[in-house]
């Protein structure tokens, strides 16, 4: 799969060029957005210069590829991203990164971002008590720790376009992370039911060639934000997020209070996490009273408390893993209409699988979300559960060895 590795390298290199793809709206650029000034080129925290100055980056007009898009999608602010927000951004030089080119690109460190940074991700069940405490503490702190980003209020579909001076709100790390996952997966915010039913089909981070690549970058962003907390609270600059190896398990063996929380009380929202876990009252951002509601933004349903249903069922086993890894074609156009599983990408995500492996058509990555259920059920809320990042770091590990 050498060609796929090359493709991923090209994609990530392009992401490094224009930092608005890093997330939503950097706090430093909120003023300009509300006044329809199309420039997001902040001052560096290192030297106070725009984009860090000539050694770090420069403020330039962004170029985006032109694609033929059906007119029904043109109201979507994600089309021709990110030009509905800004047209001028910092282009960082070398390994510099960040909204103002004052950070290092992933895998690099040092004053000049020229030293390799190696992080080792490990199975959560191999962590020491101290390491496990740090992981849990970072999750809890991320609920209130400032992310440095502003989010657009999508509580209704009438005032979300950046051209209409939308309401912006500051976001904690966890709120930002959940919003970002929802923003990438939600359908277009149409203003009437008929358009929604007819055209509410877009999903930019699932059910397609983008799934593993988008989530790899997402994991890196998340890990970077947690590292920033770890530096200030624990003095740890090389924090690496653990993963959960669930291959061949018959139940969630880390759904205990030692790890990510045992089952607790039940309410009208569902089965909550045990009060003996620090995760028992984690906020469920982008809460959805009705699962997978089309044409609705993150704030439509308000906030809840995370839940898990812990459904019974075998998780994918070694034979399922071997089947996924045996598929050497990364993507096969039109495969979703085929009864045969042909590509690694779609098998990894779980829209097809080993013949006869699951009569309920629940495979690999998707199967875990279905069995855990609760907050993990849906793209809007899944990333609120700490289990999400453990699961997706493991999926990324499989992607890496493919």
What are these regions (language model features)?
Residues 1-19:
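Classical eukaryotic N-terminal signal peptides for Sec-dependent ER targeting/secretion
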């Amino acid at each position: 799969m050498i060609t796929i590795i090359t493709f991923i390298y090209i994609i990530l290199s392009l992401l490094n060029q224009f930092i608005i793809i890093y997330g939503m709206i950097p706090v430093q650029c909120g003023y300009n957005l509300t006044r329809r000034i199309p420039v997001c080129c902040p001052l560096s925290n290192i030297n106070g210069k725009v984009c860090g100055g000539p050694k770090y980056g420069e403020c330039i007009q962004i170029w985006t590829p032109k694609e033929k898009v059906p007119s029904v999608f043109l109201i979507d602010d994600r089309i021709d991203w990110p030009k509905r927000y800004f047209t001028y951004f910092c282009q960082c030089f070398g390994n510099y990164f960040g909204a103002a080119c004052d950070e290092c690109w992933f895998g690099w460190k040092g004053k000049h971002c020229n030293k390799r940074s190696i992080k080792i991700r490990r199975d959560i069940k191999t962590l020491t008590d101290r390491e496990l405490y740090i992981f849990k503490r970072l999750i809890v702190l991320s609920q209130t720790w400032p992310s440095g980003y502003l989010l657009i209020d999508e509580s209704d579909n009438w005032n979300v376009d950046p051209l209409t001076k939308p309401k912006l709100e500051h976001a904690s790390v966890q709120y930002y992370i959940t919003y970002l996952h929802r923003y990438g997966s939600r359908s277009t915010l149409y203003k009437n039911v008929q358009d929604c039913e007819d055209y509410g089909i877009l999903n930019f981070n699932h059910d397609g060639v983008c799934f593993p690549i988008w989530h790899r970058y997402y994991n890196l962003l998340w890990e970077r934000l947690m590292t920033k907390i770890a530096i200030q609270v624990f003095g740890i600059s090389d924090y690496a997020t653990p993963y959960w190896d669930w291959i061949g398990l018959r139940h969630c063996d880390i759904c205990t209070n030692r790890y990510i929380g045992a089952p607790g009380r039940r309410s009208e929202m569902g089965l909550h996490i045990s009060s003996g876990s620090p995760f028992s009252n984690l906020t469920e951002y982008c809460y959805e009273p009705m699962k997978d509601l089309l044409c609705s933004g993150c704030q439509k349903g308000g906030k809840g408390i995370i839940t898990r249903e812990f459904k019974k069922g075998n998780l994918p086993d070694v034979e399922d893993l071997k089947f996924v890894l045996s598929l050497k074609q990364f993507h096969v156009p039109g495969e979703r209409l085929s009864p045969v599983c042909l590509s690694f990408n779609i098998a990894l995500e779980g829209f097809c699988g080993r013949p006869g492996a699951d009569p309920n058509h629940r495979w690999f990555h998707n199967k875990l979300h279905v069995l855990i259920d609760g907050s993990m059920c849906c793209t809007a809320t899944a990333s609120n559960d700490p289990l999400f990042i453990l699961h997706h770091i493991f999926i990324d590990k499989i992607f890496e060895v493919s």
